[in-house]
Amino acid sequence: MNESKSVVDSGLMSGKIERTTLKLSDKLKLSSNIHQGTKFSLKKSVTTVEVRKSKKRKDINNIEQASVVLQNDNAYQDNESNNSLTIQEQISRMNALQNANICEKKEDIKEDTSDVNLQVTESTSVEKSESDDVTLEEESSKKVEEQVVEEAHDNTDTVSLNVVENVQEESQVDNQVESSNISDILQPKGIEEKKLKKYEKEHEEKKGNPKKGVSNNMYSKHVKLVIEEELEDNNKQVIQTHKSRKNRSTSSVKNKITRKVLIPKKITVQELASSMSERVKDVQHMLFQMGRRDIKPTDFLDSDHASVIVEAFNHTFKLVNDGKLEEDLYADGNDKELLPRAPVVTVMGHVDHGKTSLLDAIRKSNVADGEFKGITQHIGAYQIMLDGDKRITFIDTPGHEAFTAMRACGTNVTDIVVLVVAADDGIMPQTIESINHVKAANVAMIVAVNKIDKHDANIDKITNSLLNHGVVAESLGGDVIVVPVSAKERINLDQLKSSILLMAELLELKAVYDTRASGVVIESKVDRNCGVVATLIVQKGTLKAGDIIVVGHNSYGKVRNMFNSDGRSEKVAIPSMPVKVLGLNNVPNSGTNFIVVDSEKQARELISYRQELFNAELEANAKPKMDANSILACGVVDELNVILKCDVMGSVEAICYSISKITHEDIKLNVLYKGVGNVTKSDVLLAETSNSIILAFNVKTDASVKELAKQKCIEIKHYSVIYDIIDDVKKILSSMLKPLQQEVQVGTLSIRKVFSSGSIGSVLGCYVTNGIVRKGALVKLIRNNNVIHEGKIKVLRRFKDDVKEVAAGFECGILLDYSKEIYPESDIIHILEIVEEIRVIK
């Protein structure tokens, strides 16, 4: 191998070759100095040509010997590396080698052409003009280049542009050729065919004769760059082709899939695109063509437009009736077996009659001490265990007038009502209201006469008073059980429990257990650590952790956790069981129903349907807008804007109900926002924008929020008792009322003499009959019991002195701004005074 290397070097460097055209493989092995520094000339003798030819033959033989060794070594290394290459990389490498071979063939063709040109030129005419030779030389070079390019296109279509440019630069030969011999020079095709066969043979030998020890570092930097670019371009083309084929196959498969789309009454653009597995922008483009230009992904489409879009994308659709969906959900499980359930008992009565204390005595707890001032302001739900694994669910409702909605909610979910009446107070307004709720709900009732331990307790008086409201006790021949109890002394509590169980037995309370759960929301609130917390009572089915529930028209979610009345975590809740549920997205209203659905998608559809019904009901009950004439006729009415924040949703409803009853013709109360939770910065900013006050009931305000409210001059009022908030709202509204102004007659003047009457007014001499006259007082000029002038006393004098007032029994002179004729005999003057009366809303 070393010998072959030395032969190559000696062959390349021996002698001074002043003019030669080497093959590409020869040029790659020349040093950069020789390649760049040698200048060639065509004007040489025939002897020089022969010497050059002989040297060139030696060089070619040496180069061919060396190239065989190098090619064998390259083939070996190629085979060795091909084992670790992918098929695509091997193909790219083969293309690069083929491009290099084509370049070598081009060099050989140019060399043969150059030699022939030299011989013809030197034997014919050396003295031809330089300009003609250059012209003919360019024509010859162009034809040779065309032939080379055609040959290159026949062998491969991936020739590098850099290689072609290199060939064109090397083809700028300085030979002088006569135009008459050009056609003869380009004839020898046999030589080209032989060389092509030779290189094909060499290329085949590269694949099968691997030899080690010979370096393949025979390419210049330029050719290496060309080969690398060829490999990179081929890889890119293959990758792009692969991607395009993959995309075409994916799109073709996608277009073949036909989906069945469920279309509700209303659906958003985004939901419709998702159900069809289409892009949102494609659906928007289709709507744009239909004339819906400014439509967003969150905009709703009716079923007609949605069905047209589905058909345009070659899908099928089915219209869904959400009302039918809700009916089917509630009808689920009606044909299944009914099993006994625990009774739900609601404790009702007037405020301070001992309802919560009675429940504490039964549960052996102390809830009443936790209430502010001992007043219940929330609905509480508890379940107690009796002997024999029997359970009773109790619901404690507030007794204040403001909690009418809460009491109505309690009667809607209850089986039995325990009406608590204080033995010392007797029948009170909220007692009567509770009786009416019981009658409206058509539920059973037990009367518990509390506080019988007091000395002035009179049970017979209460029993007779109940007759006036249609409640007949068993002692009087009726069907209402009356139990005298004492929560404080724990008297007759067992008798009350037994009466409840007896009543439940008579009612034969049963429910389906093995079905989707449904029930009622008793109370709801926002907890800082847990989020939305809702107290539910299951009326049908079994509620499990992980179920998806829909509550009312604005709330749904997945049940993350459940807790019983004792605070222990529960996995399931059976009928008549109260639980606190975490996981809802919004705070539901008290008294709203809940039901378990199959999926979040179904939950959203049901919420959308209920929201639509709710909005339609609001529009139907909305008051008609007043036109400009009506507003002018009614006059300007002052408004008080309120932002209400409470601890639980039941309190929000109770306070809104109470303050809505505070009305006045000259002022209007607007509850701009009501919610559950602490006062936040957004509440303060809303109050600043709307000029509102913030009423906070049983909630706190952070220091940062207080500081912001102080900067914005926003008033935040905190309350713990519902009485206080109602009274305070009345005071605020009363302070906004303008005082009522009335005209009161404070004196009378009789006219004695008219001194003058002109443009400045009338000067009258008068006598104060009664009352008192003051300067600037309002006066009315009365003639024959008719008011002919109203004005003010501009000047008041006694004799020649200006005075501020004149009492009864004295004479005075006055100046009125009245220029018409006055008759002293019949005209009298009434002295008036405006008195303001402060109005109070009661």
From Swiss-Prot:
GTP binds at residues 349-356, 396-400, 450-453. The keyword Cytoplasm applies. It holds the Pfam family IF2_N. Residues 349-356 are annotated as: G1. Residues 374-378 are annotated as: G2. Keywords: Cytoplasm, GTP-binding, Initiation factor, Nucleotide-binding, Protein biosynthesis. It comes from the Bacteria. The keyword Protein biosynthesis applies. GO terms for cellular component: cytoplasm. Residues 486-488 are annotated as: G5. Residues 396-399 are annotated as: G3. Residues 121-144 are annotated as: Disordered. Residues 450-453 are annotated as: G4. SUPFAM superfamilies: Initiation factor IF2/eIF5b, domain 3, P-loop containing nucleoside triphosphate hydrolases, Translation proteins. Residues 340-510 form the tr-type G domain. One of the essential components for the initiation of protein synthesis. Protects formylmethionyl-tRNA from spontaneous hydrolysis and promotes its binding to the 30S ribosomal subunits. Also involved in the hydrolysis of GTP during the formation of the 70S ribosomal complex. This is Translation initiation factor IF-2. It comes from Ehrlichia chaffeensis (strain ATCC CRL-10679 / Arkansas). The lineage of its organism: Bacteria, Pseudomonadati, Pseudomonadota, Alphaproteobacteria, Rickettsiales.
